[in-house]
A protein has these predicted regions:
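Generic hydrophobic transmembrane alpha-helix motif, especially the helices
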Residues: 1-52, 86
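Residues that define the loop-to-transmembrane-helix transition and helix capping
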Residues: 11, 27-28, 70, 133, ...
Length: 166
């Protein structure tokens, strides 16, 4: 967990830029950079949920019945932690899309023939006054996609988290 805390100390986009600069400019390397940046969030939230589930009474009851640790982990802990992981994944997807668009806008995403929203905005900034639609349309599409993923994450949290139900 200390390594995850170390990753939390770096600003996410700077860490992604550093990784892409070391590995080279490509879609795969940008995806790796965003994944490395996202892992600490998953690790911290999953660890917290697992520690919470581990202290539940039914886990102690199952353990007293003689269940093995792998069975407890797979059948009870993972099943109860999965909703949190799914919600984090959908919420994190929105920020990952923004980060990929930012990296490609800065020239650290896919090479120019590959269509990326950030790359489209970067190229269109030269023609902003003549053809504003070239910059507005990719920006609006990024915004709508991010909002949709955030709404999806909110709805999944409402559906999957039993503590929020009245």
């Amino acid at each position: 967990m200390r390594f995850m805390d170390l990753l939390f100390t770096f600003p996410g986009i700077l860490l992604a830029m550093l990784i892409v600069a070391m590995l080279g400019v490509s879609t795969v390397n940008a995806t790796i950079a965003i994944s490395v940046w996202s892992i600490p969030n998953f690790a911290r939230m999953t660890r917290g949920k697992v520690l919470q589930i581990k202290e539940e009474d039914y886990i102690m009851a199952i353990r007293s019945l003689g269940a093995r640790d792998t069975r407890i982990l797979l059948c009870h802990v993972l099943v109860n932690a999965l909703p949190v992981i799914i919600v984090i994944a959908t919420m994190r997807m929105a920020s990952s899309i923004m980060s990929i668009a930012t990296l490609s806008y800065l020239g650290l995403g896919s090479p120019p023939p590959t269509p990326e929203w950030g790359g489209m905005i970067s190229i269109a900034k030269d023609y902003m006054w003549d053809r504003p639609s070239l910059i507005i349309i990719p920006g609006v599409v990024v915004m709508i996609t991010v909002i949709c993923f955030n709404i999806l994450g909110d709805k999944l949290r409402d559906i999957l988290d039993p503590s929020l139900k009245d």
